[in-house]
Amino acid sequence: MSKQLIYSGKAKDIYTTEDENLIISTYKDQATAFNGVKKEQIAGKGVLNNQISSFIFEKLNAAGVATHFVEKLSDTEQLNKKVKIIPLEVVLRNYTAGSFSKRFGVDEGIALETPIVEFYYKNDDLDDPFINDEHVKFLQIAGDQQIAYLKEETRRINELLKVWFAEIGLKLIDFKLEFGFDKDGKIILADEFSPDNCRLWDADGNHMDKDVFRRGLGELTDVYEIVWEKLQELK
């Protein structure tokens, strides 16, 4: 399968394929935090992220969620549908943590009565600012119906993920999703789902996600390996 690099991101490289509607995503060993301010090469991270994300996307596909995932090609590669990414990070919070706790001056780990969905404008130059529905419409990123769909689909995905992670003894604190338009103009889930873009805590409150790297709490791949081993219990 011939391929040409079309985009190089913090965690993945994206390549063309012979089919204009398909791309290859190659997961890197690079770990970043604080919008790339903290950066490190960590051997084995790309393999683990690809394994975890491929597994989660396969389960989401099987549950009827429309995603860009087609198949896992190798240890670090997966085949995806090509999408036009919507420049929004859609964050869902089940518990207080991270920037939410800092913004509102509350402790981490407080259960939210209703999960909160937030939008962040994908723009590195602006440091991905927190925006509301009206900003989304002003920036002509999405209209009312599309905004409602993004929120509804994110909540639906959350209900699936919460159950799966609870079954393996992990609490889904929060996560970030990205969506895009497929060749038919349909909004589908894109990017990845791994400990890079979610927070997972075990029963003792230990961080099982990229906060280990952000906060210098231990070896990132050790934690990701535990998550991967636990996920395989769902098979």
Curated annotation (Swiss-Prot):
Its EC number is 6.3.2.6. It comes from the Bacteria. It catalyses: 5-amino-1-(5-phospho-D-ribosyl)imidazole-4-carboxylate + L-aspartate + ATP = (2S)-2-[5-amino-1-(5-phospho-beta-D-ribosyl)imidazole-4-carboxamido]succinate + ADP + phosphate + 2 H(+). InterPro entries: SAICAR_synt/ADE2_N, SAICAR_synt_PurC, SAICAR_synth, SAICAR_synthetase, SAICAR_synthetase_CS. It is an enzyme of class 6 (ligase). GO terms for biological process: 'de novo' IMP biosynthetic process; cobalamin biosynthetic process. The keyword ATP-binding applies. Keywords: ATP-binding, Ligase, Nucleotide-binding, Purine biosynthesis. NCBIfam families: purC. Belongs to the SAICAR synthetase family. This is Phosphoribosylaminoimidazole-succinocarboxamide synthase. It comes from Streptococcus pneumoniae (strain 70585). The gene is purC.
